[in-house]
């Protein structure tokens, strides 16, 4: 496995799945159970999609942002403040699975 992204731990855990970059309401509705939700930030509109995600990675935010708080409530692993997440993880979207290891705030590409 190769580390491809690093951010800040927000909700501990580990998950593996395909990436789904979420930019619109349609993307949220199409997020499948077990996918890795990747977004700039989340809002209350994202909660249903967040509950289906295996893990959440956001480009912005800190330990008290929406993604961090809701992911802890849902028990979903979450990394926030992962600058460049949409661009970097967008490259592997639907192609290979990634492993999110929140303890170190790291995302790895599975080979």
Regions flagged by a language model, labelled:
Residues 2-35, 40-111:
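Acidic, glycine-rich flexible loop/linker segments
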């Amino acid at each position: 496995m190769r580390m491809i992204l690093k951010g800040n731990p927000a909700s501990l855990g580990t998950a593996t799945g395909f990436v789904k970059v979420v930019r619109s309401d349609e993307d949220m509705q199409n997020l499948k159970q077990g996918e890795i939700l990747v977004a700039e930030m989340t809002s209350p509109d994202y909660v249903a999609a967040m509950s289906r995600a295996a893990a959440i990675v956001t480009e912005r935010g800190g330990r008290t942002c929406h993604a961090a708080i809701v992911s802890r409530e849902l028990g979903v692993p979450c990394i926030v403040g992962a600058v460049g997440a949409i661009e970097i993880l967008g490259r592997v979207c639907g192609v290979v699975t990634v492993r999110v290891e929140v303890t170190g705030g790291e995302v790895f590409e599975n080979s």
